[in-house]
Amino acid sequence: MQQPAKPFFISIKVKKMSNRVSYKQQTGSHGLKHKLDHISRFIGNTPLLPITGLHQNKDVKIFAKAEWKNLSGSVKARAAFNIIKNAISSGKLTENKILLDATSGNTGIAYAAIGQKLGIKVALCLPENASQERKDILHSLGAEIINTSPFGGTDEAQEKAAELAKDFPKKYFYASQYTNDNNWKAHYYGTAIEIIRELPEISHFVAGLGTTGTFVGTSRRLKEYNPAIQAISLQPDVAIHGLEGWKHLETAIV
């Protein structure tokens, strides 16, 4: 059964997406940066949907940010893009290396979608009990799936990815989304700025916890803007919960 997406509630003005444009195939660092510029047009500035019927107070307004409008279909496109962009800029990721990471699915799909556009191969350590839909999408995007035990969850997948990166440093670029600062910075410099610009009176921000990048980056910047803003995180109440992508922080590796 497909698991529910993480709650991610904010308010933001809907902006019209520019039409897709073609670009010339190029190789090398310059070519990758050119392609990244093109891809960036389809990440961020996602629509805002009003949520009604959850309360009776007319003074309260709740909005859900439609992150599935991002390239690859989730909020994870923001972090994946920022990680890849900075890795290419620093020279750590080239067309001759394979991007490697652990994932429960959504970040992996973002890596694979972006990697396909860039001509960069992607290998993902994925718990064997991840939904078949996610596996099918990853395969269709050309990603290599390295199965890990369903009992170890993404924690074991992280350990496997780190092991492979250590054993084959010339083969892989280990993205390490759980420890990569470019994860939360994608939201600190992107998501949060959008919120502040479009909803200066925001009072609450709510997000689920996986890598914690969305919550940490967005809430950190919002708190700097207005310390009175309440940042609320959601997580499973038990260690064994079966929710793909969610983390029980007391027992998980983050």
Per-range role (PLM):
Residues 3-7:
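Cationic, low-complexity basic patches in intrinsically disordered or flexible, solvent-exposed regions
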